[in-house]
């Protein structure tokens, strides 16, 4: 079992984030000791890493709550989890397209300035 400080160090998350995630019910496997301090076993640590990854992918807290509440037992739960992940994939693809458009704009600006500098230098 890991204390909140140890779990934060192991996952790279802040203690604040761990408290937030457990308070929002994202880590159902978290336990409490006799002093009501959070304790994280292997299952809770795995859940933390899952939540961390989903957040890094841009998934909302609400979507993660739905995802984690479904569990992994049964075809219906797996299908519902798949739908949540597919929706996130669609969002990520849209964001990637927007980023590529912005990058194209920047590249055109860079080329324009390089051309302008070369023209000024030649004069």
Can you say where each PLM-predicted feature lies in the sequence?
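Arg/Lys-rich, alpha-helical DNA-contact motif
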Residues: 3-5, 9, 28, 42-123
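Short glycine/proline-centered loop/turn elements that form peptide/ligand docking sites
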Residues: 7, 14-17
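Minor-groove-contacting beta-hairpin "wing" of winged helix-turn-helix DNA-binding domains
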Residues: 35-41
């Amino acid at each position: 079992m890991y204390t909140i400080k140890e779990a934060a160090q192991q996952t790279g998350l802040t203690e604040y984030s761990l408290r937030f995630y457990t308070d929002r019910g994202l880590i159902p496997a978290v336990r409490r000791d006799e002093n009501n301090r959070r304790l994280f076993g292997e299952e809770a640590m795995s859940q933390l890493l899952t939540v961390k990854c989903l957040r890094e992918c841009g998934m909302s807290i609400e979507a993660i709550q739905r995802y984690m509440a479904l569990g992994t037992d049964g075809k219906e739960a797996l299908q519902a989890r798949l739908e949540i992940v597919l929706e996130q994939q669609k969002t990520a693809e849209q964001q990637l397209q927007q980023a590529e458009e912005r990058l194209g704009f920047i590249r055109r600006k860079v080329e324009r300035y390089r051309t302008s500098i070369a023209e000024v230098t030649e004069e």
